[in-house]
Amino acid sequence: MRKPETIILSHIAKRVMFFANQKVIEDSVTRLGISADDVVIEIGSGNGQALEEIKNHDPEKIYAVEISEEFRKVLQSRFKDENITIIGNDASDLSDLIPDKTVNKILLINVIYFLDPLDTYLEEFKRILKPDGVIFFSCRFRPVGGFDPKIFKNTDLEKILPSLRKYFSVSSEYVDPGEKRSRYHAIQLTNHEGG
C-alpha cells in the first residue's frame, strides 16, 4: 500500500476522508458487526474517523495500520490514552506484530485500490484472520476509475472478485445511504476455512 506521495495528494486524501466518509464509515462499522470480544484491525486508518466508530463498539482490542507518518502522528495524538495499537508497517506483512488466526474483523475503507499485489495482502489477511472472521471493504470504484492506474491498481470490482474468491467467501452489494457522495460498494469476505 502506498502513502500519499505529495502534499497535494495528502491534502486531498484528508478532505475526502472527512467530508465523504462519515456515512460510509458509520454504515461499514455497523455492517462489520463488532462485538466486545473481537480483535479488530483497520487498514489505512487515516485521520481516525473509523477508529472512533469502532471504539464505540468497545471491542477487546483495536489495531490501526497506517503507513503514512503524517497520519500516524495524528492517530497517536488523537488516541494516546486508548486501547488502540498503531502500526506503521505495510499491511502486506504484519507477521512480526500480529500472530496467526488472532483477528476477528478487518475493516478497509477506500483502501483496496492501493493493495498491490492484491493477492499478497489477501494472503496476509487470511493468515491473521480467525476461522469465520470477516473482512469488510468499503469502496467507491466509479470515482477512482479514471485515476492514475500506476497508483490506483484495483478499481474494477469484476476484475478483483476472482482474487477475493480464491481466499474467502465473498458477498457484495451497492449501498446507497441517501447521499450521492456516500454511495459505495460493500464487499464482505468471510474466512470459512480453518487454514
Report each predicted region and the residues it spans.
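Core SAM-dependent methyltransferase catalytic element
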Residues: 176-195
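Glycine-centered, small-residue-biased loops immediately flanking beta-strands
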Residues: 38, 133
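A short acidic, Gly/Pro-enriched loop at the edge of an enzyme's catalytic core
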Residues: 96-106
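Class I SAM-dependent methyltransferase SAM/SAH-binding core
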Residues: 41, 47-93
